[in-house]
Amino acid sequence: MAYQSEAALEQQFIEQLNKQEYTTVAIPDYDALVENFKVQFEAFNAPKLDTPITDKEWERIFNLMLGKSVFQSAKILRDKFVLEREDGTKVYLSFFDQDHTKNIFQVTHQTTVVGKYVNRYDVTILVNGLPLIQVELKRRGIDIREAVNQVMRYKKHSYNGLYHFIQLFIVSNGVDTKYFANSDRDLMYSLAFFWTDFNNVRITNLKDFSISFLARDHIIKMLTRYTILNDTDKILMVMRPYQVYAVEALIRQATLTNRNAYIWHTTGAGKTLTSFKTAQILAANPNIKKVIFLVDRKDLDSQTTEEFNKFEAGSVDVTDRTDVLARQMKDKNRQLIVTTMQKMANAVKRPQYEKVMDAYKDEKVVFIIDECHRSQFGDMHKDIVRHFRKAQFFGFTGTPRFEVNGKTEGKITQTTEMLFGECLHNYLIKDAIFDNNVLGFHIEYIKTMEGDFDWDDPTLADAIDIGELYMSDERMSLIANHIIQNHKAKTRNGQYTAIFAVSSIDALVKYYDIFKKIKHDLNISGIFSYGQNEDAEGKDEHSRDSLERIIKDYNEMYGTNFSTDTFSAYHKDISDRVKGKKTKSLDILIVVNMFLTGFDSKPLSVLYVDKDLKYHDLLQAYSRTNRVEKETKPFGIIICYRNLKKRTDDALTLFSKSQDTSGIVVPGYQYFVEKFNEMVMKLKEIALFPESVDTMQNEDDQKKFVVTFRELTKYLQSLQTFIEFSFDQDALIMSEQEYQDYKSKYLMLYSRQKTDREVVSVLNDVDFCIELMESDRINVAYIMNLIRNIHFDDPKQKDYDIKHIKDELGRTDNPQLLRKVEILQAFLDRVVVGLESADEIDAAYNDFENEAKREEIVAFAKTEDIDASMLTDIISEYEFSGTMDAGNIRDRIEKPLPLLKKRSLVNRIVDFIRQHTEKYQ
């Protein structure tokens, strides 16, 4: 049976949309798109318009709409605007309505748009004439990643004008279908999602997807409710299916019942966005007097503040003053309040707030509690419940409490169901890993003590002081050395960071001191909460003094000025370094309890464990490592220095509701060896020798080579995280040299494909996953560090150091560094040779690079006969916003040119700006 062609799939898709009451319209080119928009926009706004929109009025409308970024266009789309008519009257117009029955739905296909190149778009869905959803199709058997890459090409070359109003992209090959939000930035495949049913079962077939996702009432909800404008990052975010189902379930619960409920969404699944969106929607309901979003104080002080203000700018009040909360409660116009559990508990107990708080005693108030099992909440729950007699409480948790792991008070075990009632929706860790919304775990258990008995047997507690054994100098030194020796292999040469969880403050301080005695180049620090009235008997040092000492070392390491008096600022700085927000990161952070729950960091990939953990505490701690980042982070790595195997199995079984945890814990070393060897054999069937790639004339063969070598490298990436990995092993059937030779051919094809050409190539849309190929050790930061450490006081050694740096520059395959090689070599030859110390290296390099930037801009401007200052301004705007408008560039070119020549010049300017910015970023 022959494959269904892309054209046949397209026709079938359009016929399905016709059945769903989308009207097919012929739009052959961009001009036709504009004309259709005019007709549909007038029809949609007809009840508000007495007369047709005039040409001058259209000019005003297009001045509002065009030349804006994707993010700005999304804001315009959602706002009403005032059109001043030629007769002086004013009318409020809008682009679409939340009621799907009031909108006009159309579908068109094969629209040709001329940008840098001529592109033809597969299927466009229009709402009231605006292209809001773009669908790109591939024939069956083709990876839908290629459709994502095709969208990126179109964005770069021709998605301008009204196409900036595209909100969602859909990609499909008929059997696999995903959706993702538009962006001014490069699109990430990891942010393309499958749609599912309520039970998290994927709906991948294009026809079924159309019936469910593109139902007119549903797609309007996705556009109006479930696409979020992130004000901080200036990007669009579209919610995942399980988030949508949870919000819908809670809205039904709040509007149709008075019962409490909770949502079980695994750690890392985006509960904060789900809970905040629920609060936002319920706050618009006139039957609900207040919606109060409760968080723990420490959450509000850290990352949750940032998250909330992304979703709604200025939504969070970070003060600890209860009178501010009382003022917000009194304000009838303030429907949504974000506050802490502590402030709310104070407000209902203190007499001075009694009048304000009593006004809501018998009103419908909804409380939404993010991470509903924070320790403080249980203690304050009763006071709040007692006061608000008609309140509903909705909780969110990634690790619910059941009989087996709940908090026991007397003879009663407090469970999540007891506190919040029924679970309305669940999305478990196995679901999240399957959807690649979080990573699986690679867990290693390292034996650190010998003996003919079970160290985890509780009956031994009286006979043996296990705590003393765990704290022995020999054992702790063994563990510290093991961490130092293996850390770089585990973190891809320091590309990622780690947390080391230990059992007590005493253990933390002791480990910290042991690390200081070992020779290494890692940045290691610690953090803990100290007791104000601590019993210091039997201790050499009060824990606050220990922390002060650790902070002092931290200040020397990073040039900061913290102390225990500025603990919050120290906490924030450490948090930023573990998240990779600072130039100089932290390699290992030692903690007792802090950072083990609720802390999200994509660059955090390793957890070293020397403490007892079980159930929710265990999964929460492990889950710090499993945030999806990019291809170079295939899983979270857990290194256990205690026997937590059974406890790990128990926790994963409980929170996945299954005895089968195979998808959660990744297989062992031998599995990846076998997979690597399988891919080597497959690769050699395509290209027996590296040189065989040079003689490949057929692009389909080149594509097979690229895809196979890419997959081989992914298995190698996983292998390299295992302690036992070595290319010299007999178990591997490819040597390191042979791998590097094949890799050079892969990079050759990548380089050839990346060069912009009008020639259509099957490689254009292949995902090369180039970050997998980078030798991250030799990157810009590494080279600059080598330059800073040149021996300027020894001329002979200085010459050797400079030669070594040039050799390293010649060996790099890091794309960012490759763009800077010529600048760095020139800096070494012209500036560094004349320096006598490293004191001014950074300032000297910045001056040198800025001059190189200026010269490059002037040279290009001279070649193209354009104004250099104009070019500099456009580059500055692009560096700030990340967006470029070709129409704006065209308008700023003053010299008269024929249309085609001006278009060609604009394309060259756009290419120069992109390459220039990439080079100097």
Region roles according to the model:
Residues 591, 596-620, 636-640:
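A short beta-strand element within the Helicase C-terminal
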Residues 405-497, 512-521:
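Interdomain helical connector at the RecA1-RecA2 junction of SF1/SF2 helicase-like NTPases
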Residues 624-654:
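Conserved segment of the helicase C-terminal RecA-like domain
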Residues 336-369, 374-383, 591-593:
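Conserved RecA-like ASCE ATPase "motif II neighborhood" in helicase/translocase motors
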